[in-house]
Structures are given as structure tokens and as C-alpha cells.
């Protein structure tokens, strides 16, 4: 069962908390959204996803690494501090990673994908989830992959 396409470059949060895939999204973005949706409601585990992309649960950098790997732009998991140097500086058109020494999250097609309890609660679980609240990015390195 696939995620329905929406007729803009912005994803939406569907009932149940998963994200839609925007019509016209490039293949790496489609793969990223589908990968993020796979982790929806997975348990938050500190250090989860650091050793392998397959884990029982994920922390912030494990979840972001999993999604970037699915998009084809990351070979092995990185921790938050390493993600602050991944890719190129500045925001991307489709995927932007926000990272500092202790936390990371990403914005894909206009939705924030995060594990932190800050902002709007779409899902009360502690694991990776989508939300509309983007945040300011203050205190974070802003990174993207060329072309995305």
C-alpha cells in the first residue's frame, strides 16, 4: 500500500501520522518519505540505528541516517555531530538536515521529521514522527545534498 501523492511539492501528514508523497517528487525524496514512514511509531532507543540501519528502535541521528541512506545519499550511519558536516551547507529544495553536537532532525517536502518532544504533537509516541512545526533551526548546522 503506497502513500498517496498530493498535487504540490509539499507533503502532508495523513491520518495515522504517516506522510504523503508529493506529486513530482524526485525518486530520492520518494524513497526518503517511504523510509521515514517505515520508522513511524518505532521505539525511541538512545544510540538506536548507530551501528546498523536495521535496529529495534532509533534515536534522532539513527532515524535521519536511515532516511538519508534510503534516499541514496548516505553509506553508513552518522551521529548528530557528524551530520552537522554531511552534504553541503544551506537548505535543500526537498531535504534539509539540521544537526548539532547533540541533536538532529530533518525537513522533507515541507514536513519536519524528528524524535524530540518539542513542538506540535502529531503522535504521542517517543519515536520518529512527522510534524508541521518546522522550528527556526537556531543552533543547528543546516545541510543538504546537492540537487535535493
Indicate residue ranges for each PLM-predicted region.
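Intrinsically disordered, low-complexity
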Residues: 1-44, 119-148
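...with weaker cross-activation on analogous glycine-rich loops/strands in unrelated enzymes
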Residues: 33, 65, 71-148
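Secreted/periplasmic proteins that engage bacterial cell-wall peptidoglycan
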Residues: 23-93
Amino acid at each position: 500500500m503506497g502513500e498517496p501523492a498530493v498535487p504540490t511539492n509539499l507533503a502532508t501528514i495523513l491520518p495515522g501520522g504517516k506522510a504523503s508523497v508529493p506529486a513530482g517528487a524526485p525518486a530520492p525524496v520518494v524513497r526518503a518519505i517511504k523510509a521515514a514512514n517505515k520508522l513511524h511509531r518505532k521505539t525511541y532507543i538512545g544510540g538506536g540505528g548507530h551501528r546498523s540501519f536495521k535496529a529495534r528502535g532509533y534515536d534522532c541521528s539513527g532515524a535521519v541516517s536511515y532516511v538519508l541512506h534510503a534516499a541514496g545519499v548516505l553509506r553508513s550511519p552518522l551521529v548528530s555531530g557528524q551530520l552537522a558536516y554531511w552534504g553541503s551547507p544551506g537548505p535543500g529544495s526537498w531535504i534539509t538536515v539540521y544537526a548539532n553536537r547533540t541533536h538532529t532532525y530533518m525537513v522533507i517536502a515541507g514536513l519536519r521529521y524528528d524524535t524530540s518532544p518539542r513542538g506540535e504533537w502529531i503522535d504521542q509516541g517517543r519515536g520518529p514522527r512527522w510534524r508541521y512545526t518546522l522550528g527556526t533551526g537556531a543552533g543547528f548546522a543546516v545541510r543538504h545534498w546537492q540537487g535535493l
